[in-house]
């Protein structure tokens, strides 16, 4: 009965979290696009067969992501996987409305099967302090080994601590001691492409046609319409949303593919793999016994050498 209640509470919490995310997207659709929720909705797994994490499909720019995980952990123990998302201080990007806004960050950690987010009652005071204000969510109910975070304010979350609970092969024979791989991704800033395939305003806009810029119209919301007259005398109109800065002017001669705007993007996505060893306690005991044996052997050799030296001294050798 208790387990049934726990399952009901877990499913209810998961449903409410999804409802909250959907509500935020309905109210603020453009500001929410290309964050982890969209990967959850569009991909069964956040990692493609090629090894690429799907966040890179919308966040086209590459920037480094750093991860720190312990070399080895014990069974049924809590450890920290730290994801670092570095970028220069005081950098701002353009928001969906064209205004300058602080960067936000997000991260995904794909743990091996059996590893999962540690329950809060097992968090140390240090972990509680380091994760204050950070909300963790599982990629899906079935994939509790994949943990998502974000978007979060980047200025205070350039390092995100994931409290991880390791499995115990002694109580669950599905898991084994040995080396495991983690797949980690970290992002700062908005994406360049929406999941629908259309560009955001956080990308370079280029000309689809060669010709002469006939006119540039400024729309009331701050966006532009660039009218290009091609060699046939036809007018091709390029729409540029509010945000990127124009680098062309009327009467400029341009070729197909030439940039019409600067590159406003200051963020980027990065991914990496890490390894952790689930250490068997018997192996540790064996290793300790080995070192003790080596130490005793060295002591006995020293004692034997001294004994031989005494005998040789007594015999006058």
From Swiss-Prot:
It is a single-pass membrane protein. It comes from the Bacteria. GO terms for molecular function: electron transfer activity; heme binding; iron ion binding. It is found in: Cellular thylakoid membrane. Keywords: Electron transport, Heme, Iron, Membrane, Metal-binding, Photosynthesis, Signal, Thylakoid, Transmembrane, Transmembrane helix, Transport. GO terms for cellular component: plasma membrane-derived thylakoid membrane. GO terms for biological process: photosynthesis. Component of the cytochrome b6-f complex, which mediates electron transfer between photosystem II (PSII) and photosystem I (PSI), cyclic electron flow around PSI, and state transitions. PANTHER family: CYTOCHROME F (PTHR33288:SF10), PTHR33288. The 4 large subunits of the cytochrome b6-f complex are cytochrome b6, subunit IV (17 kDa polypeptide, PetD), cytochrome f and the Rieske protein, while the 4 small subunits are PetG, PetL, PetM and PetN. The complex functions as a dimer. This is Cytochrome f.
């Amino acid at each position: 009965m208790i387990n049934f209640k726990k399952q009901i509470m877990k499913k209810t919490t998961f449903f409410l979290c999804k409802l909250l995310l959907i509500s935020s997207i309905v109210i603020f659709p453009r500001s929410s696009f290309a964050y982890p929720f969209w990967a959850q909705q569009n991909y069964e797994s956040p990692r493609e067969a090629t090894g690429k994490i799907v966040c890179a499909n919308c966040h086209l720019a590459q920037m480094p992501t750093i991860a720190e995980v312990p070399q080895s952990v014990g069974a049924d123990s809590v450890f920290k996987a730290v994801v670092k998302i570095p970028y220069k201080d005081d950098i701002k990007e353009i928001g969906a409305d064209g205004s300058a806004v602080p960067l936000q960050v997000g991260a995904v950690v794909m743990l091996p099967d059996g590893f999962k987010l540690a329950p809060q009652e097992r968090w140390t005071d240090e972990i509680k302090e380091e994760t204050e204000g950070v909300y963790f969510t599982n990629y899906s109910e079935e994939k509790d080994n994949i943990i998502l975070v974000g978007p979060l304010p980047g200025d205070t979350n350039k390092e995100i601590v994931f409290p991880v609970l390791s499995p115990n092969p002694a109580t669950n024979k599905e898991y084994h001691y040995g080396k495991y791989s983690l797949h980690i991704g970290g992002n700062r800033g908005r994406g360049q492409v929406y999941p629908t395939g259309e560009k955001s305003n956080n990308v370079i806009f280029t000309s689809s046609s060669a010709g002469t810029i006939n006119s540039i119209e400024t729309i009331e919301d701050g966006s532009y319409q660039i009218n290009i007259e091609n060699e046939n005398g036809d007018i091709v109109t390029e729409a540029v949303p509010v945000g990127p800065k124009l680098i062309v002017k009327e009467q400029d001669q341009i070729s197909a593919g030439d940039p019409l705007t600067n590159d406003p993007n200051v963020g980027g996505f990065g991914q990496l793999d890490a390894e952790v060893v689930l250490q068997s306690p018997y192996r540790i005991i064996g290793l300790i016994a080995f070192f003790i044996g080596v130490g005793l052997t060295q002591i006995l050799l020293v004692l034997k050498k001294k004994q031989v030296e005494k005998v040789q001294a007594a015999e006058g050798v």
